[in-house]
């Protein structure tokens, strides 16, 4: 499977101290996305201009001549780049980085098991996010099963934009869903994320009616969904769900993803 990050000692991705596994690939393309490197399901080369010192080491090792050093920094000829990662390997300042590394199920489990002492003492666990973890259902299910066999608390941070069958399969193996709710109007949802919201709302109602534990996270973004009408419609919809926890986290917008 392709991951683009593993975050240890996470305290905002579910109860206790957790390890968060970032799975690459997402069917949404939110205009405010703070992890745009997680959208593509393939490995990518990332370049951060402000980190670049203009040493040219990446240019020297590129096997296809795809890189050029200019006054504006490194320019990549996308038609020549094979995403081999040689440039990232030699970059001394991490201006060039690869987003996406292949892991086996066993490799991911070894990383998770390293953190069990912190999980046990804090009643924490593992959180799978992305990207969109439901876009890699077979990998996600395998990891959830392995974690469940070890008694590790399992959370899935998701948009719920997936087939009902995928959601049901994950439901059987998950202790907590962290659900991102973007917009109640389907047209606006498509405009700002690239997909409509009917499937998301239907899946959310399904997990609620199944008695699953979940909490809602709403990023409030001026000009997108922070208006009174959308907030009121969100509250009305959530109040209609058979939902014991009834926790909604309102997340202030930040522009950390602009530089990515």
Regions found by a protein language model. Give the residues of each.
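Fold-independent oxyanion-binding glycine-rich loops
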Residues: 6, 24, 36, 78-79, ...
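Hydrophobic packing within well-folded, soluble alpha/beta domains
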Residues: 30, 52, 58, 62, ...
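Iron-sulfur cluster-binding cysteine motifs and their immediate structural context
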Residues: 31-38, 57-75, 86-102
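Extended, non-globular alpha-helical segments
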Residues: 47-53, 100-115
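Conserved AdoMet/S-adenosylmethionine-binding subsite of the radical SAM
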Residues: 106-256
